[in-house]
């Protein structure tokens, strides 16, 4: 039966560490005692977490008894009780059957020798010599003998002065045969039987307690091991963070050095001009000073002929006032460097603020599981071999769209470009990092509308995909429900079941953004799809298959759809929808566009085909217009 030992842990509740009692199973597949799990969730409250894997449930799951596991536990407990304990397993100590030599009972007849037996009728203890009459005389034949008993008075009933030969488990006391009348509703037993029963109960309790002590020891070891794992993980992450911050400090130091050098170079340039001007002015001053001295000297001459000869020469020499040319620092350059530094500081503050915000839980309702995305089993449009063979470029983390630059215009230090190069090096070793994709997604969620418009593309509706009930106008940028069926010529890409139309161009890589104006905001949808999406039947409707993703307005309800799974969204008064498609990092975001952009829903998907903008209109008067950037 040694194989039952490892099974004991599998059949134990991780909350109470005991074998399952009325076991129930959670949706995530873990088993617990029904009472343990109910008490845990009652204290915990919403949201409800699985005590083992920490899976989150917004609503309390409906629990049912696991009858198969219950039967297995019962059979295990029966087998566990039936099997003999192995040699290396602890067993309770045996109860002493005879008094120790130090606690001998004296003979009540001679008071010298040690008693060998006690007569429960005579209520006396006898040595071997004085016990002989009980063996020889017929009068003593029915007297029960027991090993020597100390303090016989305790064996007598104080009420009836009779020997207490029975034990009442209900009142936990020994009673005589006359007391049985008062305990007729109880279940008394003989002293030997009651002693054996209690001994068996206590032995089993000790065995259970020993098992619990072992379980507690294992739990303590497990907690210590988990603490060690947490400590090692935290230390490893701290080292990684320190490395990242060291690199950021190096970038900041390099930026500071470059900016300081540019300003110093500008200072040197201006001072060099001032030095040149100073030398010119010094020479000019010397020339004027020499001319002044010559004039003063000529005025001292008394000979008129000599004076006229000298003065006529000096009179022809002209002088001009001293002129200082305009020389200033390049204030535009200095202001640009200073403003770029302020912008960088503000960007850092915003990034630090986002880091300090509480992280959303894993059960984010505004996010779709990429595992639910599959290829359509009924392709209509084939994808070229070149597209299938083409590899995705390594994802690059999106940096703020307007990072500052430093230095003179001819030698700019672009931190954004430096960040992209560093990110490209990082992604070369981890091309499919989920954490990197999550960071890029968070970066785009924090962008403003002007920043999103940097990725704007012009969407043209494809005439060959439009349903006969969809009218196209305004140079194929407006789709509406036609009052009369349109006589479009047959085409294999045309929708025949749902009033839908696709964009003309597909997108396999890169980042793309477009906006759609909704009129009437009723019975319409905006999304994306693979070119292989069905064009016929109910599965061709946007979001009702694995090849399309959309946000849909149906009466007053707004929903996100994919793979025929609906997620109800909060209502919005915005009449314009922005769609951001990031093929490289695998996500599409739907924004409600007003004065600011607000998140409606996001899907994270590892796209496998080229994607087309997709639109659905149904109700009369419903119109979708492709917007121009404003």
From Swiss-Prot:
E.C. no: 6.3.2.n3, 2.3.2.27
UniProt superkingdom: Eukaryota
Principal location class: cytoplasm
Record text on activity regulation: RING domain dimerization is required for catalysis, TRIM25-mediated RIG-I ubiquitination, interferon induction, and antiviral activity.
Post-translational modification: Auto-ISGylated.
Region (Disordered): 355-403
Residue numbers of N6-acetyllysine PTMs: 273, 567
Quaternary structure (record): Forms homodimers. Interacts (via SPRY domain) with RIGI (via CARD domain). Interacts with ZFHX3. Interacts with NLRP12; this interaction reduces the E3 ubiquitin ligase TRIM25-mediated 'Lys-63'-linked RIGI activation. Interacts with the KHDC3L/FILIA-OOEP/FLOPED scaffold complex and BLM at DNA replication forks. Interacts with RTN3; this interaction prevents RIGI ubiquitination. Interacts with YWHAE.
Protein name: E3 ubiquitin/ISG15 ligase TRIM25
